[in-house]
Amino acid sequence: MAELLKGAPVARALTEELAARCAALRERGVVPTSAIVRVGEREDDLSYERGALKRCEKVGIEARRVLLPADVSQDELLAVIEDINTDSSVHGCLMFRPLPAGLDEDAVAAALDPAKDVDSMTPASLLTTLSGRGEGFAPCTAEAVLALLDHYGVELDGAKVAVVGRSLVIGRPVAAMLTARNATVTTCHTHTRDLAAECRAADIVVAAVGRAHTIGVDAIREDQTIIDVGINWDEAAGKLVGDVDFDAAEPVVNAITPVPGGVGAVTTAILAKHVIEAAERASK
């Protein structure tokens, strides 16, 4: 029976530390503030927004929601970003992605001030994550993966890791961050010839493809640690599930994150951490 790597204890520890740092900033007259920009009403965006608002409240961060219709124009969205850039009381900006069709996400990302980019949306922040140079913030979910592994004492130095997924939001950043911690990382994707074999060879598997049950019983073995980043709705089961077949993996592997209740809880805590750090930098 696998150890469940639950996100709540990790998030709770981070929240306690961040609340103290937030209180110290407020004593100096600095109110850490995050702008949360949502275009449209995608269910996963709404879910993340609820979690982010709760986390900000617990830490003491002021959250300002900017809610835009799905048919907002490119110019209108860019104007919102410019307002955030020039508002010195706003320290961080979270914008839910992907944006609706018709909007140029790359142009919007490039318009945001990197100092306020708390989820690695801008090219400058991504460069920091992938190169290890600079002061940009890593993607919250990617950093949450490492925070969770560290909290539970999972050894990364020299470990073989299979990262399944190569998106710029999770896959590539988490692979770079794990490599920086001296893990030996294999990035798997749709053209990987034998995905199951690559996963079986790994000590740690990070599943981040956004497709339910991508990692099945043929891809796991004993003594592995499984980090399931996926959040998918299983119509047949009527519940949220990850990218890993949890029922097949949990009796076999050494440790696994549940979905829900795993990485997601830590992601909002990392978001709060980035907002606090941005406020600390801006107030120096």
Question: What residue spans do the PLM features occupy?
Answer:
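Positively charged, low-complexity intrinsically disordered leader regions
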Residues: 1-30
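N-terminal glycine-rich anion-binding loops that anchor highly charged ligand groups
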Residues: 24-34, 40-58
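Anion-binding alpha/beta catalytic cores of soluble intermediary-metabolism enzymes, centered on
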Residues: 92-156, 213
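Rossmann-fold NAD(P)-binding glycine/threonine-rich loop
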Residues: 106-126, 230-283
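Short beta->alpha junction loops
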Residues: 40, 64-74, 190-192
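Short beta-strand elements in bilobed, periplasmic/extracellular small-molecule ligand-binding domains
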Residues: 34, 56-70, 185-187
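Short, well-structured alpha-helical segments in soluble
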Residues: 76-88
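Glycine-rich phosphate/diphosphate-binding loop of Rossmann-like nucleotide-binding domains
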Residues: 39-53, 136-225, 229, 234-250
